[in-house]
């Protein structure tokens, strides 16, 4: 394995691919809800339903993508195929401006590509290191930070291109980014020769009437068509129900097979953390839907004579995550003293509290809009930044707990279940919540008048809902704190 003095050379090609994948995914995501409502003239109900269905299914398909990589394709081929599908999907999405029937197919292709890419790029990175290599953690941190760079730049670049040229050009820029990442990755192909490749024996093995490579081709053709039908008929919720039922059944099986009380206790903790994470992300994912439309309709986006494109506001969250994450890493050191469970609940309370504070600021912004016609941009930026800061106290804490569990062979499964619930189900619930803002009336000329009161109500309800979650978490935190203190007093 060729290395520099610090990291394997191959990591820089993986990091480049990750930057451009984030650029592609978040650039398109920043435009999607605005494209549906402003260009295709979907009503808010339809737009929210399709947006939440798309954001939900991108968290379901990585389960199948991981299986295909493990059994047939290998991580490297799965990542390349996924990147290619996402690029094609973004190009087809641009064509839907003149042929709306392409909309569902394009989103389905992106979902399939994301499934092959997302679950396997981290596994490919892991293949670059020996199990005990001390550089491993640094490599994953580098990839995560690089991804945030892509998600910061993407809404700015794609939003600007869309505003100055066209929607098709905005989506094409996302596709170009993904192609650029794939080309860079292919240029470093010689550095990945030691990683697992395609399982030729398994691909050529016959099953039923066809070899496995034939069934793989059938899957690559039919899966996008099937998912497109789910989008078209708004049947995505049924796929989520099936996936959730399977995930919960697997979780119950793991719990029943746990051998010690400590293992069962850790599993119960993970389940409760996942429940609060689900609620947190149902609130946080308003950023791409209801909050985006609120900014577009009710926020003064002018800086002198220039009007800031709505999509650019999607960069604030990612920027806050990266900046605050670096500050926290520098200022805060994990204490080895005290009870870890107590610390976990303290962090969750802080994360949910910050989410409540962020939506409180948005509620003030909406009330300002109701009083003066439009709200100020700095108030909006502050609210989004606080919400981004909140993320640092939820997912990293929950994922850390999952990786610590002392049950062999279940970490990957539990991670998948966590992503299913806090990703797919949370995005579906986010769509249900966002739909409450879709109240509108029509004036005499037939123009739509959107209700600012609906946004005030929803933002206020989320503020109080997140605050209620904080109250419950603080009760749990207090219970564990008193339990630890009682135990210490008994020992003394």
Swiss-Prot record:
Topology in membrane: Multi-pass membrane protein
SUPFAM superfamilies found in the cross-reference section: MFS general substrate transporter
GO cellular component, one term: plasma membrane
Key words, A-Z: Cell inner membrane, Cell membrane, Membrane, Peptide transport, Protein transport, Transmembrane, Transmembrane helix, Transport
Matching PROSITE patterns: MFS (PS50850), PTR2_1 (PS01022), PTR2_2 (PS01023)
TM regions (residue ranges): 14-34, 49-69, 91-111, 138-158, 167-187, 212-232, 236-256, 269-289, 312-332, 344-364, 379-399, 413-433, 458-478
Species assigned in the record: Klebsiella pneumoniae subsp. pneumoniae (strain ATCC 700721 / MGH 78578)
Superkingdom to which the source organism belongs: Bacteria
Name of the protein this chain belongs to: Dipeptide permease D
CDD domains assigned to the protein according to its UniProt record, in alphabetical order: MFS_DtpA_like
InterPro entries for this protein: AA/pep_transptr_DtpD, Dipep/tripep_permease, MFS_dom, MFS_trans_sf, MFS_Transporters, POT_fam, PTR2_symporter_CS
Presence of the UniProt keyword Oxidoreductase in the record: no
Transmembrane helix keyword on record: yes
Biological process, per Gene Ontology: protein transport
Predominant place of localization: membrane
Location of this chain's protein in the cell: Cell inner membrane
């Amino acid at each position: 394995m060729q290395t520099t003095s610090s990291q394997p050379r191959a990591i820089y090609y993986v990091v480049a691919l990750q930057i451009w994948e984030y650029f592609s995914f978040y650039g398109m995501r920043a435009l999607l809800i605005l494209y549906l409502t402003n260009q295709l003239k979907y009503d808010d109900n339809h737009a929210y339903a399709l947006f939440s269905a798309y954001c939900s299914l991108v968290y379901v398909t990585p389960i199948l993508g991981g299986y295909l990589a493990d059994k047939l394709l290998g991580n490297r081929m799965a990542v390349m195929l996924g990147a290619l599908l996402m690029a094609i999907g973004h190009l087809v999405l641009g064509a839907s401006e003149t042929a709306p029937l392409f909309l569902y197919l394009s989103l389905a292709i992106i979902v399939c590509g994301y499934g092959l890419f997302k679950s396997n790029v981290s596994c490919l990175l892991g293949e670059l290191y020996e199990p005990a290599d001390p550089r491993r953690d640094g490599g994953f941190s580098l990839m995560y930070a690089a991804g945030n760079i892509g998600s910061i730049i993407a809404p700015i670049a794609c939003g600007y291109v869309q505003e100055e040229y066209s929607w098709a050009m905005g989506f094409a820029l996302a596709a170009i980014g993904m192609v650029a990442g794939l080309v860079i990755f292919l240029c470093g192909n010689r550095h990945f020769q030691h990683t697992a490749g395609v399982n030729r024996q398994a691909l050529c093995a016959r099953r039923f009437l066809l070899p496995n490579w034939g069934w793989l081709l059938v899957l690559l053709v039919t899966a996008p068509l099937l998912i497109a039908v789910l989008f078209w008929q708004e049947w995505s919720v049924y796929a989520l129900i099936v996936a959730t039922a399977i995930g919960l059944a697997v979780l119950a099986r793991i719990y029943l097979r746990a051998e010690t009380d400590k293992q069962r206790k850790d599993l119960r903790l993970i389940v409760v953390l996942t429940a609060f994470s689900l609620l947190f992300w149902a609130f946080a994912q308003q950023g791409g839907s209801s909050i985006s439309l609120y900014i577009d309709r009710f926020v003064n986006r002018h800086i002198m004579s220039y009007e800031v494109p709505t999509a650019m506001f999607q960069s604030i969250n990612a920027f806050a995550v990266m900046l605050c994450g670096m500050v926290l890493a520098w200022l805060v050191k994990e204490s080895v003293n005290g009870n870890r469970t107590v610390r976990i609940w303290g962090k969750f309370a802080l994360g949910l509290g910050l989410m409540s504070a962020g939506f409180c600021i948005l509620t003030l912004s909406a009330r300002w809009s109701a009083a003066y016609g439009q709200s100020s941009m700095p108030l909006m930026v502050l609210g989004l930044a606080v919400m981004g800061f909140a993320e640092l106290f939820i997912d990293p804490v929950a994922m850390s707990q999952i990786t610590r569990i002392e049950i062999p062979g279940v970490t990957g499964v539990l991670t998948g279940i966590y992503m299913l619930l806090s990703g797919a189900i949370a995005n579906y619930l986010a769509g249900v919540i966002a739909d409450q803002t879709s109240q509108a009336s029509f004036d005499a000329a037939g123009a739509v008048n959107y209700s600012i009161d609906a946004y005030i109500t929803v933002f206020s309800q989320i503020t109080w809902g997140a605050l209620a979650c904080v109250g419950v978490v603080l009760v749990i935190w207090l219970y564990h704190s008193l339990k630890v203190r009682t135990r210490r007093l008994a020992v003394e």
